[in-house]
Amino acid sequence: MRIIFWGTPEYSISSLDIFIKSKHEVIAVVSQPDKKRSRGKKLISSPVKSFAEQESIKIYTPEKIRDNINFINELKSLSCDLFIVIAYGKILPKEILEIPKFGCWNAHASLLPRWRGAAPIQWSLMKGDEFTGVGIMKMNEGLDTGDLLLEEKIKIDNNDNLITLTEKLSILSAKLFLNATSLLEENINKNTNYQLTKQNTLGREITYARMIEKSDYKVDWGNEAIKISRKIKALYPRANTTFRGKNLKIIKIKVLSSDEINNEKYCLMSNYSKPGIILAVLENEGIIISTKTDPIILLEAKLEGKNISSKKQLIQQLKPSLGEYLSN
């Protein structure tokens, strides 16, 4: 099949790579334009554009795609069978969706219609979902509202964070894309149906994964410990707090269980009814901080201007005192 691939971040590369190595022909790649991302205002290409350049594939980086007549005519001239779209960054308008012979397919990193939108991986972790997955859908003009064609569910491990889960779903997306194109080819060869069968999603809850905002990265110590833990995993490694006026990125924590709280080694802890207070500083355990519910131990963090530090290094760097506060 003649394929045009649409994608922008590193997350998309697994899918592009698998199609390049397949029997299909990737005739062009569409990605977001170069952006100024460094202090020197140097223009930086998207990861997908850089990868496509290495593979000597024709690349388009239009500033706009809606009502872009020249770009649309160029796409039409390529006689494409299928558009493969993963994390491109813009919703494709009707005039583009109608170009390829067999439609436009998108891989979405959730169990649709749960977590439609821009940040499904973050919100599945933030809300403590037990499972997530990838769905291949035939795109329409809506926000992740197209027909679901193929889906695979995976369990979210307790140790998963944004980085690890993103990698798993990126690889799964590539596999499902290839499976879906194989199924489509089987149908075409049988002359039975030039489309895949729509999957049934009736009864599933519809939720929306809005974009992550700057304020979301702040740790609210007045929240339940489990919610704080989920946020740190979901926004890894950027969830942060403030200590003595300096930014402190929270990389990894442990929520103390009831049995651990009652253990003798934590007897230095004061009343932890006030959230965000340092309850204890234990050399072999770490810095213990109160929340709305159970206390947490700070296992890894990054003070501004420093590298990521272990619990013992943090004690040496911060020299925290009992009763000090961490602010939102």
UniProtKB/Swiss-Prot annotation:
Binding site for (6S)-5,6,7,8-tetrahydrofolate: 110-113
GO cellular component: cytosol
CDD domains (UniProt xref): FMT_core_Met-tRNA-FMT_N, Met_tRNA_FMT_C
Keyword vocabulary terms for this entry: Protein biosynthesis, Transferase
Alphabetized GO MF terms: methionyl-tRNA formyltransferase activity
A Pfam match: Formyl_trans_C
Enzyme Commission code(s) on record: 2.1.2.9
The reaction(s) this protein catalyses: L-methionyl-tRNA(fMet) + (6R)-10-formyltetrahydrofolate = N-formyl-L-methionyl-tRNA(fMet) + (6S)-5,6,7,8-tetrahydrofolate + H(+)
Coiled-coil region: none
Highest taxon listed in the record's lineage: Bacteria
UniProt similarity note: Belongs to the Fmt family.
HAMAP family per record: Formyl_trans (MF_00182)
Function: Attaches a formyl group to the free amino group of methionyl-tRNA(fMet). The formyl group appears to play a dual role in the initiator identity of N-formylmethionyl-tRNA by promoting its recognition by IF2 and preventing the misappropriation of this tRNA by the elongation apparatus.
Protein name in UniProt: Methionyl-tRNA formyltransferase
Organism expressing this protein natively: Prochlorococcus marinus (strain MIT 9312)
